[in-house]
């Protein structure tokens, strides 16, 4: 009996200084370090004015097309930025693999595997949960809400 094949056919990413594969490879080849001192805005949002560190920040996290994903704008505002990015990246990975153009997509099984790091977003918005509900806010929900 033969084992089913596993093929990686699509890739999507968001990293500091790289929004796609080409930018990522360029950073690798050039050996560029995209970490920067924590910005004043980031320190203020975190409530840590004395935060003296370097971090790698992904740009454009506020650029989310809630309507495209069928999400109410009010809910999208409270969604963890990583959750919004997961939705975009899952879609981009499927597109990169050419699965949306395939007439056989419905006949096969596909998976999107992701990795993410922790972040302080949940504590920043948790006081608003009663008002807007928990969907898309708690980090444990991020990988579970996508068909």
Protein language model regions, located:
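Cys-dependent condensing catalytic cores that perform Claisen condensation/acyl-transfer
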Residues: 1-147
């Amino acid at each position: 009996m033969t084992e089913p094949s596993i093929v990686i056919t699509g890739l999507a990413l968001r990293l500091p200084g790289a929004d796609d594969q080409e930018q990522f490879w360029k950073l690798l080849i050039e050996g560029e370090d995209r970490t920067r001192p924590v910005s004043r805005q980031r320190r203020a949002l975190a409530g840590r004015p004395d935060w003296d560190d370097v971090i790698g920040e992904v740009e454009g996290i506020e650029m989310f097309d809630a309507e495209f994903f069928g999400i109410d704008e009010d809910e999208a505002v409270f969604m963890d930025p990583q959750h919004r990015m997961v939705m975009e990246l899952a879609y981009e990975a499927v597109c990169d693999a050419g699965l949306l153009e395939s007439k056989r997509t419905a006949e096969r099984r596909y998976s999107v595997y992701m990795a993410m790091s922790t972040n302080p977003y949940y504590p920043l918005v948790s006081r608003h949960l009663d008002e807007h509900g928990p969907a898309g806010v708690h980090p444990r929900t991020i990988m579970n809400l996508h068909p």
